[in-house]
Swiss-Prot record:
Xref: SMART domains: AAA
Function in brief: Mediates export of peptides generated upon proteolysis of mitochondrial inner membrane proteins.
UniProt source species: Schizosaccharomyces pombe (strain 972 / ATCC 24843) (Fission yeast)
Protein name: ATP-dependent permease MDL1, mitochondrial
TM spans (from-to): 158-178, 196-216, 306-326, 386-406, 423-443
Length: 726
């Protein structure tokens, strides 16, 4: 933005070589490289000619940029407004002519984002994703039998748990019958009961105590077995899901947010594991108890059982509809929980940006909206559960009252004894409780099916780029000519916004090729296509005439080293991050790669190579993270080295030192270097420059040829250097 137009004071943080920013400053405040105090404060006109000034000494580090800059700017016609690429939006910078104070700090360089589509384009793309997305699988109903496939190989554990369940349930269901016999013996009129069921009373009660101990022991064993079985299933399921995620291509992660995938790996897998163990066990126990209870009720009195059976159809029908409702609601709830996890992960990861723009209240309100949605779903389930279980409880209690009334008449008529009526009532309570429990287990299993549908979506996802399928990559691939032939590409989430259209060029082995394009022109997309994170929509990418899509992806990527513009580090030590690309690397190799990438700062840390970098490397500066990323790439000694604006996060001094390392690598003709950059100092060292714009190659050639007036490269460099006002 133009600070003059909006009446703002601008405080840019810039590298010393970024004179397009520095020349517009009214005041310069250079910071020393070794200290955090201000070295000088003056206007740029006073600092530039002073050899002892900090700005002068640091600006000399990029003198090679100035040579090319001056050679271009001297040939330019003043006042011309040239910007050669459509669909790109240059920012309206202008030289300050009004007395507005601004400061330039020589530290940080700001990169502008790419073209943003219109709202209509975004809506059109989203509608296509929802209807035609190749990775958006429909919400299929998962049957119980497929759910059991997740527990494959656990048959022996299920057999043990089932056997223990039968024994413990048998002991439990014998209690009403035994109680009835004790009551009949006590109501016989004999003052001293010596035998119960033909067994001496003392022996009977000791045996009864032993029976209860057996039931408790079996119940203990069942719970332990099923808990371990549940954790085993969940652990194996999570490992399988995570391995599946690691095998999917970039298009999948464009469609599915990380927070939703984390929710599937954690919450959904836990629900499914419990459904296959604890809930299934409870359901089996309720089934056994209900069947045994009804059988004993028939044995005691078929007449009372006939009256009792009138309650079964409405309860069974209600349980079926309730279970189906909960299954669908569970799927919706798990989706909402996945959205909540996604938002939490995204907002917490960018909390500093939120705080910098005072967006705390906005983000809290947005998070509360997701919580409110989840609460509404939980409230719907609560009302449904209350209606179902309240109704079944009322019907059960009403049935008990009816049984008492009818049973009392039958006792008075002498059709049954008091003990038999007591046993029947206890069996009624047991059977009724088991039926209600069975309904609850059915509900929990339906929840498991809802969660399982999300897991099977992930397990059934088929990437367009299979990681382990394809022919072996020849060992001589490092000397191959890489060719783009009429390549067309659009990101899967935005199929209507074409990035490339008939893109064609060659990269010869052992050369240093620079890819140049305006912001949003597809520079980084070329590296993603080369690494096969995505597949071209049309055309082919060849290696010595062989389509790289026929190669094994893992083997193909093993020949590449990548240094991205945004360094990515993992939690762990510095040494572990450098050795990430080569797990068997020795300490010597790690230190050598770090030395070549100018990671001398590691030796200043107390723990040196064992220093923890923190989550995503937050304990290191941007430049330190970038140099570790460079060392990680160099450790592999790749045949193809992709530098995607690899020095963008470094300060001037560190960049020059790393550039020397990269420059020495470029002289190594056994390695092909593909540089994606916008800095003139990096571009001018390339053997070949490929200028990309409007989805195709506009021109290619050497720096000397393309830097002539009239070329697209010349116009782009003039705009980047601030010599042309857009």
């Amino acid at each position: 933005m133009d600070p003059i137009r909006f009446g703002l004071s601008r405080v840019p943080f810039a590298h010393c070589y970024n004179k397009r920013v520095i020349f517009r400053a009214n005041y310069l405040v250079p910071l020393t490289w070794l200290k955090n105090n201000v070295a000088y404060k003056s206007t740029n006109t006073l600092l530039l000619p002073t050899p002892n000034a900090e700005y002068y000494s640091t600006s000399k580090l990029s003198s090679q940029v100035n040579v090319s800059l001056n050679s271009l700017s001297q040939k330019a016609s003043s006042g011309s407004k040239i910007y050669p690429f459509k669909n790109s939006f240059p920012l309206p910078f202008s030289r300050s002519i009004l007395p507005i104070r601004s400061l330039a700090f020589l530290k940080l360089c700001v990169r502008h984002n790419s073209t943003v589509p219109s709202k209509d384009e975004q809506a059109q793309d989203i509608s296509k994703i929802n209807t035609n997305g190749t990775l958006q699988t429909p919400n299929k109903k998962v049957n119980v039998f497929r759910l059991f496939t997740l527990a494959r190989g656990q048959g022996w554990n299920f057999f043990i748990a089932g056997s223990l369940l039968l024994v413990s349930s048998g002991v439990t269901m014998s209690i009403p019958y035994i109680v009835g016999k004790i009551l009949d013996a006590g109501s016989s009129g004999d003052s001293s009961v010596t035998h119960i069921m033909g067994i001496p009373s003392g022996t009977f009660y000791i045996g009864l105590l032993g029976l209860f101990f057996l039931g408790s022991a079996c119940n203990f064993g069942r719970i332990i077995t099923l808990r371990l079985l549940s954790e085993r299933i969940v652990s194996r399921l999570r490992a399988r899901l995570f391995a599946k995620c690691m095998s999917l291509d970039g298009a999948f992660f464009d469609f599915h947010k990380h927070g939703d995938l984390i929710s599937r790996l954690t919450t959904d897998s836990s629900i499914v594991g419990k459904s296959l163990s604890m809930y299934l066990s409870d359901g089996l126990r309720s089934s056994v108890s209900a069947i045994a209870g009804i059988g004993m009720m028939l044995y005691v009195s078929m007449r009372l059982t006939g009256y009792m059976s009138l309650i079964v159809p409405p309860i069974a029908l209600g349980a079926f509809f309730y279970g189906e409702y909960v299954r669908k609601l569970s799927r919706t709830t798990q989706d909402a929980l996945g959205d909540l996890t996604r938002v939490s992960e995204e907002k917490l990861a960018n909390v500093r940006t939120t705080q910098a723009f005072l967006g705390e209240r906005q983000e809290v309100n947005r998070y509360n909206d997701y919580i409110r949605n989840l609460f509404v779903l939980a409230k719907r389930e609560a009302f449904a559960s209350g209606i179902f279980f309240g109704s079944t409880g009322f019907l059960g209690n009403a049935t008990v009252i009816a049984i008492l009334a009818l049973g009392g008449r039958m006792v008075a008529a002498g059709d049954i004894t008091v003990g038999q009526l007591s046993s029947f009532l206890l069996y009624t309570v047991y059977a009724g409780g088991s039926i209600v429990g069975l309904s609850g287990c059915f509900t929990d299993i339906m929840k498991g099916l809802g969660a399982a549908s999300r897991l099977f979506e992930l397990l059934d996802a088929k990437p367009k780029i299979a990681p382990t399928v394809g022919i072996p990559v020849p060992v001589t691939v490092g000397k191959a000519i890489l060719s783009f032939r009429n390549v067309g590409f659009a990101y899967p989430t935005r199929p209507s916004a074409s990035i490339f259209d008939n893109l064609s060029f060659d990269i010869h082995p052992g050369t240093n090729v620079a890819i140049v394009a305006p912001s949003g022109g597809g520079k980084s997309t070329i590296s993603q296509l080369l690494l096969r994170f995505y597949a071209p929509s049309s055309g082919k990418i060849l290696a010595d005439g062989v389509d790289i899509s026929t190669y094994n992806v893992h083997q193909w990527r093993s020949h590449f080293g990548l240094v991205g513009q945004e360094p990515v580090l993992f939690s762990g030590t510095i040494g572990e991050n450098i050795a990430y690309g080569k797990s068997n690397a020795s300490q010597e190799e790690i230190e050598d790669a770090a030395k070549r990438a100018n990671c001398s700062f590691v030796l200043s840390f107390p723990e040196k190579w064992s220093t923890q970098v923190g989550t995503r490397g937050l304990q290191l500066s941007g430049g330190q993270k970038q140099r570790i990323a460079i060392a990680r790439a160099l450790l592999r000694n790749p045949a193809f080295l992709i530098l995607d604006e690899a020095t963008s996060a470094l300060d001037g001094e560190a960049e020059v030192m790393v550039d020397k390392t990269i420059q020495s690598l470029m002289h190594n003709r056994s390695m092909t270097t593909i540089t994606i950059a916008h800095k003139l100092a990096t571009i001018r060292r390339a053997d070949q420059i490929i200028v990309v714009g409007d989805g195709k190659v506009l021109e290619q050639g050497s720096f000397e040829r393309l830097s002539r007036p009239g070329t697209n490269f010349y116009k782009l460099m003039r705009w980047q250097l601030g010599k042309v006002e857009p």
